[in-house]
């Protein structure tokens, strides 16, 4: 199984930080490896302390379910097939936008999780990091 390297994780975080600065919203940004283990994390000056674990858990959730966290919210509503998911695993699963698997050549090698802004801002910053992963090594 291929997994993200520390150097690649740093480049992902750098790209996400750049987008966060561009939209003027300091963020907590986490990258996990293919096994869901924390590879790198940064809390930008001004980012919420409460968002540290949320960013890490978004990345973990994205790798654990191999999908963007924003895709899980509709499925976790009352009456839906994944209702209660956000309470599973000790509350470590996050079902709103900002977590994205990092894919290369169709394989998931890690994930990014971003938190502090609105869910749209978190998603935008996570997308910038995920896009940067596509160019690592190219």
Language model region names:
Residues 1-138:
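Flexible, solvent-exposed loop/hinge segments and secondary-structure transition points
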């Amino acid at each position: 199984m291929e997994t993200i390297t520390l150097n690649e994780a740093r480049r992902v975080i750098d790209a996400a930080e750049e987008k966060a600065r561009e939209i003027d919203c300091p963020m907590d940004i986490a990258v996990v490896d293919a096994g869901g283990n924390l590879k790198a994390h940064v809390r930008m000056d001004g980012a919420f302390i409460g968002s540290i674990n949320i960013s890490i858990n978004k990345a973990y959730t994205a790798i654990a379910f191999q999908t963007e966290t924003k895709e899980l919210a509709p499925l976790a509503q009352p009456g839906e097939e994944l209702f209660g998911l956000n309470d599973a695993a000790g509350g470590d699963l996050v079902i709103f936008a900002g977590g994205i698997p990092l894919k290369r050549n169709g394989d998931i090698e890690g994930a990014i999780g971003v938190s502090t802004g609105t869910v749209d801002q978190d998603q935008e910053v996570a997308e910038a990091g995920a896009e940067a992963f596509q160019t690592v090594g190219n």
